[in-house]
Amino acid sequence: CRHAKGEPVEYALRAAGLGLAEIGFSDHIPAEEDGFDDWRMLRSEFPEYLEKVAQAKREVPDVTVRLGLEVDFLEGEGATEWINELSQLADFDYLIGSVHYIAPGWDIDNPRWIGRWSGEAEVEEIWSAYWQIYHRCARSGLFDIIAHPDLPKKFGFTPSGDLRRYYEPTVQAALDADLAIEINTAGWRKDCAEQYPARTFLEMMHSAGVPLVISSDAHAPEEVGADFPRAARLALEVGFTHTARFCGRRRQLVPIDPTLAEKADESER
């Protein structure tokens, strides 16, 4: 995508160097019309993305390379058909559903629009709009995983009150749709300084039996695997014992390695 750096081969080499068993590539899906925004690949670049991931598979045999897409859930005429069309162009291992836009031209995690978070009423309005779309994303039946659930907290803005009012419908939707949800470590690198999603959300996931994926959301090779020990420790503390992996859009549960979590303790000494 146009807000990342490096080539898939570099990411795969980093994963291999860290001793990771596999790495998944999940570039943002191109929009049906070029010019939709300035941070995703163009339609014409989609075949190049597929080839570069295939190249990483060939050139870095020490790590399993999975092919995915992060799919912005956009509502409107033809949106679902476009997702289905692109998803048939390769043998994807997984599709991740995400929400960035709550209105045309307004991607809420874009620093360009930070001035719109001007007060408590605006924060509540943005969060409410986001989660309504996110619930529909989870229930759409299009995806295997849903990404960074509480993304609206990226800049540190959260509404007052019990946030479980937003979390509960999403956890139920994920359970009903048989989706996995990620711990996304990128949140620790943002203003919110907290993983996506919050611990309370993770606890609700575990209680409901929703599977977990751990993701670094790397946009540079050096971010591959970032804070994985910390995420593994958190997952184990909440009660998770396995994470989900995907191959050919089929899910497999793999035990969390407790020695990975121990590395988080070592780094804090």
Where are these regions (language model features)?
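Non-catalytic positions within long, well-ordered alpha-helices that form the structural scaffold/packing
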Residues: 16, 88, 138-139, 206, ...
